[in-house]
């Protein structure tokens, strides 16, 4: 693996997608081979799994089913899109990766971070990011952003009660502590221009 694998993590409404859309042209202008993608999704099979995971009417989905679907989508996305790009020396910017599963299914769903980590180690063959940016934000602020975003489709996870979203953030903070060697926490409750500037500086200082 020759390229650089950067993942952007955070609770709902933290600004991950908007951030990546801004990072992509910045690094392209620097003559960097760069690719943006997302989880679950990024390729046809994983996008189909994403549709299942996000369907509002699938409220009966059991936690283990959810965890395994995310891991399956991750595996296919990794081997079909991410690894080939890394082998061609790309900077890959990915909206979510393993840490999402640890926070959402491992902690918030109560399945256990160690169990979810082992499932995903198998799915990814121990492929881990070069760097992870965690966008930290209070759940109330993130969910309020979602409500104001008319262009964003509300998914099944958005519909969870506030206690779930608080557990997600708690889970993320534990993940940040556990993997402090590769995860940098950034305050997402700031103007997007400042957030972009801060994240660009982190990526350039640590990787480029």
From Swiss-Prot:
A Pfam family hit: Thymidylate_kin
Record: residues binding ATP: 10-17
Signal peptide annotation: none
Catalytic activity, EC: 2.7.4.9
Catalytic activity: dTMP + ATP = dTDP + ADP
One GO CC term, this protein: cytoplasm
SUPFAM superfamilies recorded: P-loop containing nucleoside triphosphate hydrolases
Top-rank taxon, per record: Bacteria
GO BP: dTDP biosynthetic process; dTTP biosynthetic process; dUDP biosynthetic process
The entry's keywords: ATP-binding, Kinase, Nucleotide biosynthesis, Nucleotide-binding, Transferase
GO MF term (any one): dTMP kinase activity
NCBIfam families the record matches: DTMP_kinase
Identification of the protein by name: Thymidylate kinase
Protein's organism: Bacillus cereus (strain ATCC 14579 / DSM 31 / CCUG 7414 / JCM 2152 / NBRC 15305 / NCIMB 9373 / NCTC 2599 / NRRL B-3711)
Protein's gene: tmk
């Amino acid at each position: 693996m020759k390229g650089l694998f950067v993942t952007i993590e955070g609770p709902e409404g933290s600004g991950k997608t908007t951030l990546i859309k801004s990072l992509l042209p910045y690094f392209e202008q620097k003559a960097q081979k760069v690719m943006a993608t997302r989880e679950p999704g990024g390729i046809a099979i994983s996008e189909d799994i994403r549709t299942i995971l996000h369907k509002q009417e699938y409220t009966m989905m059991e936690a283990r089913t959810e965890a395994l679907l995310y891991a399956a989508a991750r595996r296919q996305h990794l081997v079909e899109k991410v690894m080939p790009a890394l082998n061609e020396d790309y900077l890959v910017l990915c909206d979510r990766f393993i840490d999402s599963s640890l926070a959402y299914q491992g902690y918030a769903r109560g399945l256990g971070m160690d169990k979810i980590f082992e499932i995903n180690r198998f799915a990814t063959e121990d492929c881990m990011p070069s760097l992870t940016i965690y966008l930290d934000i209070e759940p109330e602020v993130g969910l309020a952003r979602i409500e104001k975003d008319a262009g964003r489709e509300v998914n099944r996870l958005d519909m969870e009660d506030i206690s779930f979203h608080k557990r997600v953030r708690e889970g993320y903070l534990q993940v940040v502590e556990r993997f402090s060697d590769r995860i940098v926490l950034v305050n997402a409750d700031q103007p997007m221009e400042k957030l972009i500037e801060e994240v660009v500086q982190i990526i350039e200082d640590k990787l480029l």
